[in-house]
Structure formats: structure tokens, C-alpha cells
Amino acid sequence: MKAKVLLLIVAMLLTACSYRGGLARVPAGQEAATIRPIFFATTRQTDRLPFGTLRSRSSIYGLVDVSIPPIHKAGQIEWPNAKPDPQKHFLLASTETYQDGAGMRAGLNKVLAKKDPKDRAVIIFVHGFNNRFSDGLYRIAQMSHDLGLPGVAVTYSWPSAGNPLNYAYDRDSALFARDGLRRLINEVTKSNAREVILVAHSLGSMVTMETLRELRVSGNTRALNRIGGVVLMSPDIDLDVFKTQADAIGKLPDPFIIFSSKKDRALRLIEQLTAQKNRLGRLEDVKEIAEYNITYVDVTAYSEGGINHFPTAKSPALLKLLGQVPDLEQALSGDGGRTGLLPGTVLTVQNATALILSPVASR
């Protein structure tokens, strides 16, 4: 009974945090606004267009041009309603699907070729629990836009149920989704990208770590060596599980960054559900991961109410801070924190670095 009550509380928190619409196209005869091209790979079946909740053992690849409205506010997704308007809503300006992963790689190379060599980084975003295809697509478009990321974004949409009551289904889907992410990483690391960065949120962190582990165990060092960094945001991973994954991977991609918040109510409820207070995204002390070369970024000070499960993407103040840093990758590494590129307190414990960001110091 207690578990059912906690699940209901999780559902209420996650559904009350924001309105979520769906995908809609720019109406015929209207001009798109600011365009962000987003490549995608998904292991969702096309049971309900665009992509539903059922699992597919094969991947579908494509490209979507996302139109971002001029009224956009940092940290938000302006969802379309019954009357989609490119001046007010996130919309699809154009869509394209590829026959296979090689086709997507060719399309990716075309986009990369138009960029300055220093801007040819590719970011692979892996969404979290309770996400639909549209959530992951629009979220990486929003983050890329708000942070002014110069590279190319790819979203991996694994078959989450998009329902806060289906946590068990999503946990199983996270394991199911490993092969699809592995295939995507293989294709992207064969592209002309200068470097490949993995960014994952919540339960997507489990998908990411399991996939990195599989790459190492299978001996795919080519793909692993092309990964220039990993960012886990509010990771929903048991600490002991994470340690076994990290041990199997061996030398972690550098930088390896974890964003956390002690006010993350979603992870706190999951800890109560599992009766274990050891989620990676809510550690009390960086000593827990001191043996690993990791930068643990505490963004508790940027919590703004609600469930606080995604402040890195939703806090306007934090987005503004990160967006103003000239070299964000260096700033979020341990050395960057010590050189004062970001405001806050830096603690070093063995191999790990804790960076506690301070909005007061940033004024």
C-alpha cells in the first residue's frame, strides 16, 4: 500500500509540474521562426504516429528542423495548442527519415561540413523517465538554443511510456534501449564530428552507463575513444550499480560530469520506493565517488520549487550562467572550477571534484 501511495505522489508531482502538448507542424503559408536541426534515433514502434510507447528491436533514424518562437523564455518549452503558431510555439518546420544509420551519418556529415571545424561537436541527448518522443526532441532543442551550443544535437528516444505511473515499464525499457543507443553511438562516432558528447537525464543515465559498459566489455574501444565527455543530469541510478558500471568501463570519458540537487523531490521519492537512500543524483557527500575522476556539480542553490528534477535545463538563472561561460567544457571540469570560471565552492576528494554552484557569487 505504501508503494502505491508513493507512486501516486510521484505521478501528481510529475504531471503537475508543467503542461505538455504534442508535436505540430508549422501551418502552411506561415514562416518558421528560429530553426534548430535535431537528428534523432528511436527504438519506439510507430504504433501511434509520430512514435509511441511500444518497443522496437530496430532503430529508426531521422532529422527534424525545430522552429523556436521569438517569445521563447529560457528553461521553458512553449508547447503548441489547437492553433499552432510559429510566433508562440515550438513546432516542426520539416522532417526527414533515413533508410538506416549510415543514411543518418551521411546527413550528419553534411550539416557538420557547413560548420567551422571547432564547432563540429555532436551532442547525443538521452531523455529520462516519463518522456514521450516530443519531450526529448523539444528539450534538446530548447537546451541547445538557451545555451547557444554551436555543435549538432542528436536525440535518442527510447521507449518510455510517457506516464508517471509506469515507472516499472520505463525501468525495463531503459535496459531494452541499450542496443539502440549502442548503434547510434557507433554511427555518430564514425562521422566527421570533432568530438562526441553524451548528455543524459534521469533514467536516461542508466541507459547511457549500461551502453558505455557494453562498449567496453565488447571491446569496442574505437567508439569509446571517440567520446569526448559525459554529462549525467539528476541521474536515477543506484550508487552501487553505478560503481559496478564505472569499474567495468575503466577509464571514464573526460570530462565526466554529474549534475545533482539535494532538493530533487523525484529522486527522493524513488529512494523511498526502493527503501535505499543512494541515488547518484542525490548524494550527500562526494566521498561516495571519490575513487573516480568525476566532477560532481551541486545545483541545489538553483532549485526553484516543484520537483527540482531538471534544474540544469529549466532554471533560467542557471542557463544564463552556463550560457555566459566561454568554454563550458573546461569550466565544468575540476580544473575549470579551480580557476574560477564558474562561481561557487570547489572541493577535491581523491580523484573526484565537487563544484557547489552559488547564484549569490555570480551577481
Where is each model-derived feature located?
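Bacterial N-terminal signal peptides that target proteins for export
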Residues: 1-7
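C-terminal motif of bacterial Sec signal peptides marking the signal peptidase cleavage site
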Residues: 13-16
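Lipolytic serine-hydrolase domain surface
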Residues: 18, 22-98, 106-112, 116, ...
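Alpha/beta-hydrolase fold active-site loops
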Residues: 121
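The conserved beta1-alpha1 loop
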Residues: 124-128, 201
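Short catalytic micro-motifs in class I SAM-dependent methyltransferases
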Residues: 127-128, 210, 234
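Short substrate-entry loop that stabilizes the transition state in hydrolases
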Residues: 131-136
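Gly/Ala-rich beta-loop-alpha elbow adjacent to hydrolase catalytic centers
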Residues: 181, 200, 204, 208
